[in-house]
């Protein structure tokens, strides 16, 4: 597997391409980060974009991350995933307002820009009239995506307490280990299929879920995020070697992935 050692001053960024696969890779700095992206075999064969998104940016002791799963039944779900993923990565690196109310307000404010950009994605001219009408109806209802985003600020010898902040809507997986014991139960009942973000209305199905806690110095932790294309990981609690995760991404047992898959794992 590809390994990236710590870059100058601990800077590292990865943003997935929805038009290509990215085999499982590892970055090692203050965090150990494993990341990957794969399209469903159907999308790959037809040359279509994937509808998932994963992005991570590290700068020394801090890490910002986003994972999105575009809603296929909405109009251009890949657009919502890409737009929201990039927008949240920027926001995480600049905001000083971490309250639930501030985040919910931000998620509503960005719909104007998203809707304006979505209007530029007109259905291709060669599609049949009936299909064009269906696509235009979908376009008026907006593009939607599920998401998980967050920021980690590591504790240090001088600053003994760090923190992790996360927000999400939807049923993508969010799993958390503290000192090798999984403590993900808090998140399970809030990972709801009917919740997502829309370019038209912002949060759908309720307000975003926001979680924040302190991080203790010297306590090993692991955070794992993935979309439902990798649901084979659901029952697995132990730390898997790279080769086994890549097998799940290659999915030889089903002739390729049945759904798009984005994967991000952080250890510190």
Q: Which stretches of residues belong to each language-model region?
A:
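C-terminal catalytic subdomain
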Residues: 1-8, 125-135, 199-268
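N-terminal entry segment of metal-dependent catalytic domains or homologous docking segments
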Residues: 2-92, 172, 205-208, 212-213
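Short Gly/Pro-enriched turn/cap motifs at secondary-structure boundaries
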Residues: 42-47, 137-140, 253-254
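Acidic loop->beta-strand submotif enriched in PP2C/PPM serine/threonine phosphatases
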Residues: 47-58, 139-165, 187-227, 231-235
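Short hydrophobic beta-strand that contains or immediately precedes a catalytic carboxylate
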Residues: 65-69, 167-169, 224-226
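Helix-loop-helix
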Residues: 86-126, 235-259
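Catalytic core of PPM/PP2C metal-dependent serine/threonine phosphatase domains
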Residues: 101-178, 206-217
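A short, surface-exposed interaction/processing loop segment used at functional sites
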Residues: 176-185, 189
């Amino acid at each position: 597997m590809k390994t990236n050692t710590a870059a100058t001053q601990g800077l590292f960024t990865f943003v997935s391409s929805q038009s290509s696969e990215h085999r499982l890779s590892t970055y090692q700095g203050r965090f150990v980060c494993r990341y990957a992206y794969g399209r469903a075999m159907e999308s790959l064969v037809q040359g279509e974009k994937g509808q998932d998104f994963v992005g991570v940016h590290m700068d020394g002791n801090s890490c910002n991350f986003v994972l999105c799963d575009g809603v296929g039944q909405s109009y251009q779900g890949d657009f919502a995933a890409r737009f929201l993923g990039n927008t949240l990565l920027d926001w995480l690196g600049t905001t000083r307002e971490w309250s639930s109310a501030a985040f919910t307000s931000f998620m509503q404010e960005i719909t104007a820009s998203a809707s304006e950009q979505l209007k530029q994605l007109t259905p291709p001219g060669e599609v049949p009239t009936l299909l064009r009408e269906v696509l235009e109806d979908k376009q008026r209802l907006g593009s939607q995506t599920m998401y998980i985003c967050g920021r980690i600020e590591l504790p240090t010898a001088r600053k003994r307490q760090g923190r992790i902040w996360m927000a999400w809507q939807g049923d993508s997986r969010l799993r958390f280990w503290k000192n090798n014991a999984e403590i993900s139960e808090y998140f399970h009942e809030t990972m709801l299929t009917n919740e997502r973000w829309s370019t038209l209305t912002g949060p759908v199905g309720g307000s975003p879920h926001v979680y924040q806690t302190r991080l203790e110095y010297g306590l090993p932790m692991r955070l794992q995020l993935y979309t439902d294309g990798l649901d084979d990981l659901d029952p697995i609690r132990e730390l898997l070697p790279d080769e086994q995760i890549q097998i799940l991404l290659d999915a030889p047992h089903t002739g390729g992935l049945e759904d798009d898959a984005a994967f991000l794992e952080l250890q510190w």
